């Protein structure tokens, strides 16, 4: 029986994390170390600090991580990607190009005879009003459409400038 792995909140690309490339390499090295032992990997949100996927443009970077996800799925390892509050704007790039299974909602599933409730967790509990407003804004299709109308060159400045 192969193992199932759960990871979350890597926040790849975060300005708050010094040596971001080193962090990505460590994550990739870990995934490489489990690739022959894993039947599935569940990425439970916020793997990226910010991921906004335009129709024809995805954020630059993360090459090693995305390549490793592709390698895992090519080997037959199921990779499940749950959107978190930092990467909810994930479209179909990760599924089409890397073969990952995207989950936008919580999932109850059975793994080796045990039932698991899997979610990122940002919406669990009793959030305050500010959080509810922010969550509504992030999930608003109207606001996403408006943001998508901004050229990626300019919109990326909103989340990459200090």
Name each model-derived stretch:
Residues 159-162:
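Conserved small/polar residues in nucleotide/adenosyl-binding loops
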Residues 17, 25-28, 121-153:
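Binuclear metal-dependent hydrolase catalytic cores centered on His/Asp/Glu-rich metal-binding motifs
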Residues 6, 115-119, 125-126:
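Short hydrophobic-aromatic micro-motifs
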Residues 2-3, 7, 12-111:
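Core catalytic region of metal-dependent phosphoesterases/phosphodiesterases
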């Amino acid at each position: 029986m192969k193992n199932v792995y759960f990871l979350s909140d890597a926040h790849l690309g975060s300005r708050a994390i010094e040596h971001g490339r080193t962090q990505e390499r460590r994550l990739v090295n870990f995934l490489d170390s489990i690739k022959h032992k894993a039947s599935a990997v569940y990425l439970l949100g916020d793997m990226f600090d910010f991921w906004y996927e335009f129709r024809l443009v995805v954020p630059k970077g993360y090459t090693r991580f995305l390549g490793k996800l592709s390698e895992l799925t090519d080997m037959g390892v199921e990779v499940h990607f749950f959107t978190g509050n930092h990467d909810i704007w994930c479209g179909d790039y990760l599924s089409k190009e890397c073969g990952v299974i995207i989950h936008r909602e919580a999932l109850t599933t059975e793994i080796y005879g045990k039932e698991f409730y899997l979610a990122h967790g940002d919406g669990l509990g009793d959030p305050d009003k500010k959080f509810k407003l922010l969550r509504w804004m992030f999930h608003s299709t109207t606001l996403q459409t408006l943001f998508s109308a901004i050229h990626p060159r300019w919109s990326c400045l909103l989340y990459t400038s200090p």
